């Protein structure tokens, strides 16, 4: 990529935007920005800058738990830039995945769930609320990223909302209204179908 100067105000504006709705009496985007700038080094990429900002915000979570939410939002913002924002397209990529080492078809989605999603893609795509990805704290998001979000060639390919919709469809199959209800309940944090971490 191209080299560009790191701008304090650009980092602070981004962190202020991602801090909206958090406790402004305790969460200080300026402090996080200052600490990030202190940790910079020549040649840092934008992804590394985001990782540094997230780790910096997470390190302040002992001062207030909303710093953990800010850290997760930084990670989610980065994930959203590197993944597709159409659920059915991601599901298609996961179903049609070809292993880069073996060259063989290695689907990550069952044919049955794939077919149900494709038959109902307009409804499912329209129902997903990507803003809900910003509701996780840092530990929760990193757990999802490490253990639950599916990868293609080592890179995370889907988003938390994609995973939740896949789970909801996997549970209810062709009962789409039930799947949407379950998706909403999971994505709003009312319950989860997680394995122990």
Where are the regions that the model predicts?
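Extended catalytic cores of very large enzyme megasubunits
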Residues: 2-197
